[in-house]
Amino acid sequence: MIVVFLHGWGVRNPDYGALPEWLRERMGASVVDVWLSDYITYSDSVTMGDLVDAFERARQQNFPGVKFACVTHSTGGPLARQWLATYGVAAAEGLLTHLVMLAPPNHGSALAQLGKGRLSRMSLWFDHREPGEQILDWLELGSFESWRLNQGSLYQPLPFLFSLIGSGIDAKLYDHLNSYTGERGSDGVVRAAAANMNYNWIELKQAGPQLNVTGKQRSAASAFGILPGLSHCGPTMGILSSISLQNASHHLAAQWVERCLGVTTLEAYAQVSGELAATLEKAPDQGSMIVVRVKDGAGRPVKDFDVYLTGGPGYDPGQLPKNFFIDRQRNQITPNALTYYVDHRVFQQTRELGLRVGARPEAGPVNYLAAEFRSQEATVAAVLRAQETVMVDITLERRLDQAIFQLRRAA
C-alpha cells in the first residue's frame, strides 16, 4: 500500500511527527510505501487549483496508475478532495482507496478571515511567516471554492473516507486577542462541524414573502470522530505533530489512522464508523454551522442583505433560546455568504427554526421583498445536526419597478 502524507497550509517545514515511520514499522516496510509531500502554500500566487495540478503531476511522475491512500493534516484534506473532484478519471478508477483527514477545514476556518498579516504574528503556528493569500481565501468560511467543492461532493463517489479532529485547546497556542483560538467545539483552528463530511444542503426559493424548500440533499454517510486531548497542532497536543515513536502505541490519532488504513470492506468501514460515532457524544461541546448563500434568480450574488435566525412559536429572533449564539461571520471575498455558528445543545430547546432574509435596496427601480422560511420540528432535527454543517442556498426574486422600462403607442 502506498501512503501519501499531505501537510497543511502555511507550512515551510512539514512536521508529520513519527506517524509515517511508526506506520511503516507497524504494518511492515513491504506493505507500506510512505511518500511525504512538501508543497508551497505561503506564496500569494499559489491557488488550490495549482496545488491540485502539481499533486497530479507528482503522482504521475512517481507512481502512475497505482492505487494509494492519503493521510492529510489540515488543508491537506481539502487538497486531496479537490484532487478527487478535478481528476475524475483517477477517481473513477478508484486509485485513491483511503482518505484519512486529520483536522481538515472542509467547510473552512473562522481564523482565515483574520488575514495573513495577523496570522503570521501567531508565531507558534506560522513562525512569523505570512501564509499565502489565495489559499487563505479558499479557507474562509463560505468561500465560493469550498462551497463548490462541498456541493459537488454530495454526488461524487468517494473512497473510504475518514475525518478525525481533536477537542482540546492547547493553552500555549491560545491568542488572548483572538477568541477563535479557544472557541468551543473546535481544536483551536478548525471547528468539528467544519471538519465533518456528514452535512446537508438545502435550497430555498422566494415566492412573495415566503421562502419555499425546492431542493435538499444529504451527503453520503462517512466516518467522523472527535478525539479528546488533541489540538490542531503543536508538539504537546497536536493531532499529528505530537505523535512520537514512544507514544504512538497509545496515541489516539496514531491508533485510529492505523485502523482506518486497515479497512478493506464496507462491513469493516461501517464498524469503524460506528465506533468513531460513539466519540461524538463524549465531546465537551456540540456546535452546528449554518452557511447561507444568497443570490438572485439569475444566479448573481446578492451582497447587501441581513439574515436572521428565528425560533419559538412566533418565529421571532427574540424567541430563540438564550446563549445559543456562538459566532456570526460574513465572507469578505464572497460577501453573499454568511456563516452562523450555534450551540446545538442549547438550540435543541426550540422546536421551530426559521430564517428571515432582508435584502437591499428595499425600494427603487430594482428592489427586493423581505422573505421568511418557517420549518417544522422534523425538518430541524433532520437538517440541523450536532457537529455538522448545513449549507443553505437562498434565491431571492429581483423585483423591477414598472417605471424601469415602458412602451407607449406613438401619437
PLM regions: where:
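Short, surface-exposed "cap/lid" segments of acyl-processing enzymes
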Residues: 1-33
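Serine-dependent carboxylesterase/thioesterase catalytic core
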Residues: 3-9, 48-151, 296-303, 307, ...
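Short beta->alpha junction loops
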Residues: 36-47
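Helical cap/lid subdomain of alpha/beta-hydrolase-fold lipid enzymes
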Residues: 53, 85, 89-279
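Short amphipathic beta-strand segments in non-cytosolic proteins
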Residues: 306-329
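Short Pro-Gly-centered beta-turn/loop motif in secreted/extracellular proteins
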Residues: 329-367
